[in-house]
Design a protein with these regions (language model features):
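Alpha-helical transmembrane segments of multi-pass small-molecule/ion transporters
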Residues: 1-302
Length: 302
């Protein structure tokens, strides 16, 4: 427990620091959107690219982990569709709820995996992201637009333009080509990657909106409980059924125990979803994850 807390508390300290820096408008209100963009389009893709470019793609863990990811996401998606039919949610509300249950904070996830498992864990996590990011994006867009319909192009275009997915694909191709990262490229990418996670966590804190917590308390509460407790339990069940080893099980459960992504608010607003509910879900889940994530990982590892 002590080792786990030592690995996780600095990550949440950065999130809290980001919130208070934004609250004080330091260095300026305009800084944070720009910082988020440079991280999303340059620094974080550099981390994913370098992780996959040097990862052992012949690792027998990869097909096991891929199967576990898709099975867990598929089961959660089916449960959401059943709940939508029973509750009669509108597309805008269903889209926010879906993202609250399925999306995950990649910055926090990779930072936690890096603290717990180092480069080996980061390589596995990057490969998980290559599957999870496009799958969850398709589910999110469909959920937000289900009532008015959306073309295949409308579903796939955001995925094809996503810098995280492009970085994963490019890194895997470089790896398979055998070219490696010559001429100091590895050092350049390492420097960019080193800046990504701290800046990303500060931006997560800066994006929190506590004022949105005064709205739909029951919806915020049960959505957070499902995401932070029930979904990790589902992932653990899948890992047990498939017989995943300890490290793979921990990484799988960790990613399914993460709070939802701050970028879910942008997508919800762009596609006409319930952005107020989405903002509240993001904020409450991120705050509660400071307690739930150590709890889940402690129970998982005995």
């Amino acid at each position: 427990m002590t080792a786990l807390l030592l690995a996780l508390w600095p990550l949440f300290a950065l999130i809290v620091a980001g919130y208070f820096l934004r609250l004080r408008a330091f260095p300026s209100a305009e800084f944070w959107p720009g910082a988020e963009r440079i991280n999303y389009f340059i620094l974080f893709p550099a981390l994913l690219f370098s992780s996959l470019a040097t990862a052992p793609l012949d690792n027998p863990a990869l097909p096991r982990l891929a199967g576990a990811v898709m099975l867990a996401l598929g089961l959660a998606w089916i449960a959401l569709l059943i709940a939508k039919r029973l509750r009669g949610w509108s597309a805008g509300r269903f889209g926010a709820i879906t993202q609250g249950v399925l999306r995950f904070n990649t910055y926090l996830g990779l930072a936690a995996v890096g603290s717990l498992f180092g480069k080996e864990g980061l390589a596995l996590a990057a490969l998980m992201l290559a599957l999870m990011v496009p799958t969850v994006n398709v589910m999110s867009v469909w959920a937000l637009t289900a009532e008015r319909g959306v073309s295949v192009r409308g579903l796939l275009l955001p995925i094809a333009k996503n810098p995280l997915i492009l970085a994963c694909v490019a890194g895997a191709l470089v790896n398979l080509s055998g070219l490696g990262l010559p001429g100091g490229t590895d050092r350049l990418l390492s420097l960019l990657a080193a800046a990504s996670l701290p800046l990303g966590l500060l931006c997560v804190g800066a994006a929190l909106k506590p004022q949105e917590l005064g709205g739909e308390i029951p919806a915020l509460g049960w959505n957070s409980a499902v995401r932070l407790l029930a979904v990790p339990l589902l992932a653990y069940g899948v890992a047990m059924v498939l017989g995943l080893p300890d490290m793979e099980t921990t990484i799988l459960v960790l990613f399914f125990a993460l709070p939802t992504a701050p970028t879910a608010y942008v997508l919800t607003r762009q596609l006409g979803g319930d952005s107020h509910l989405m903002a509240g879900i993001i904020t409450l889940q991120t705050l509660l994850a400071a307690a739930s994530l150590p709890l889940v990982l402690t129970l998982l590892n005995g």
